Swiss-Prot record:
Keywords per UniProt: Ribonucleoprotein, Ribosomal protein, RNA-binding, rRNA-binding
Ribonucleoprotein keyword on record: yes
Name of this chain's protein: Large ribosomal subunit protein uL4
Basic and acidic residues compositional bias, start-end: 92-109
UniProt GO cellular component terms: ribonucleoprotein complex; ribosome
Classification of source organism: Archaea, Methanobacteriati, Methanobacteriota, Stenosarchaea group, Halobacteria
Family the entry assigns: Belongs to the universal ribosomal protein uL4 family.
Quaternary structure (record): Part of the 50S ribosomal subunit.
GO term, biological process aspect, one: translation
Species annotation: Natronomonas pharaonis (strain ATCC 35678 / DSM 2160 / CIP 103997 / JCM 8858 / NBRC 14720 / NCIMB 2260 / Gabara)
GO terms of molecular function: rRNA binding; structural constituent of ribosome
Length: 248
């Protein structure tokens, strides 16, 4: 199985033999498990103050008064979960293990399967990515792309390759997040667009494009390749990155 190598102008620059990893069977079940496990294992432990709701001089009136034994302060119930300012009934426990396990072989197979999905044009299109019909997948570009520094240079290359429409799609899809995250540094949500996989150093030029991510071939993971557990992300590989990903 071969792929066409494009230069920075979008012209043919030869062919390259694709590694065997691109022939891996599609395993959406393992991809989903691997992504969910990675997300779950990043969850920070959450707990509550053990004295929350108990900092009050309230006392129980005891028996023989024809009223409930709940602690009271100025005639009003305190401390119990059903009372105003009472303790939480079932608070989150810091010692709870929120992580998910996945076998090492399954995780590696999920990554290989997600890599192979980037070469399937139908699957990439089903995921919502936009690219020219003439664009061949997997999209391989010469190593000169790794030397680009300015964002505009990367924009010109992506336009020549016929995938810049996907960057614009992500930029137009940027919206204000619903919920509490807007006050916690996560104000906006943005669709994922092009993933750029390089060999050694991450390319600076494509790092600031809307929805794009940059990863090295030895560090790219199943979350990069299948955001939201959906495989088939539009991915740009440099020629050297293909050689390194063969070892995955």
């Amino acid at each position: 199985m071969k792929a066409t190598v494009r230069d920075l102008d979008g012209d043919d620059a030869g062919e390259v033999e694709l590694p065997a990893v691109f022939e891996t069977d599609y395993r959406p079940d393992l991809i989903k498990r691997a992504v969910l496990a990675a997300q779950a294992n990043r969850i920070q432990d959450t707990g509550t103050d053990e004295y929350a709701g108990l900092r009050t001089p309230a006392e129980s009136p005891g028996s023989g008064r024809g009223m409930a034994h709940v602690p009271r302060q100025n005639g009003r119930a305190r401390e119990v979960p059903q009372a105003v300012s009472g303790r939480p009934a079932h608070p989150p426990k810091a010692e709870k293990d929120r992580g998910l396990d996945i076998n090492t072989k399954e995780r590696k197979l999920a990554t290989r399967s997600a890599i192979a999905a980037t070469a399937n044009a139908d699957r990439v299109e089903e995921r919502g990515h936009e690219f020219d019909e003439e664009t061949d997948l997997p999209l391989v570009v010469s190593d000169e792309f790794e030397d680009l520094v300015k964002t505009q240079e990367a924009v010109d290359v992506l336009e020549a390759l016929g995938v810049y429409d996907d960057i614009e799609r992500a930029e137009d899809g940027k919206t204000v997040r619903a919920g509490r995250g807007t006050t916690r540094g996560r104000k906006y949500t943005e669709p994922k667009s092009v993933l750029v996989v390089t060999s050694d150093d991450q390319s600076l030029a494509a790092r600031n494009l809307a929805g794009s991510d940059v990863a090295t071939a030895d560090e790219v993971n199943v979350e990069d390749l299948a955001p939201g557990t959906q495989a088939g992300r539009l991915t740009l590989w440099t020629e050297s990155a293909l050689a390194e990903v063969a070892e995955r």
